[in-house]
Amino acid sequence: PNPYLVSVNPAAAELLHIDHTEWTRPEFAEYFSGAKLLPGSDPIAMLYSGHQFGHYVPQLGDGRAIMLGEVRTNNGERWELQLKGAGLTRFSRDGDGRAVMRSTIREYLCGEAMHGLGIPTTRSLCIVAGEEVVWRETPEPGAMLLRMAPTHVRFGSFEVFYYRRQHEYLKTLADYVIQYHYPHLVGSENAY
């Protein structure tokens, strides 16, 4: 409730062609906290599998992040917008789906530092907070991080369908990734 903007990353906003005058509008915090949906948005939590603590886990998924949607810029770039700390999803398992301010700030700063060092990573658009208190060892202020990347598809996105033997979904996902991120492979004999 009552979302407000904690910080905006001007460099990331520029990638989306967001004018700095937009940051001061109340709607900015409402849209990028998930309180209001962006036009055409249909938020989802992504399913994936992978390894944790040395063991394969057949189903993980975004336990506290939702994909708000995708922005296509005037120069043809695609950016997926993901809100971390958004609350429970169908993949939350035992957690509450929330994030606290300290970990949100840490991820914001570390991600941008990695980018500055030339290491490919998600970019941080903004931190949004509200009145919610999140319980960890002690009560802490809650916050959400709006992350952006050309895609949030990961290796585990493919693994989950491979190990479930859902080859038609695996092919659909591969075709999507090829079409939008490796278009030079479309129609290639060795596209996969």
Positions of predicted regions on the chain:
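Broad phosphate/nucleotide-binding scaffolds in NTP-utilizing and phosphate-metabolizing enzymes
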Residues: 1-105, 109-157
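ATP-dependent phospho-/nucleotidyl transfer catalytic cores
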Residues: 104, 134-192
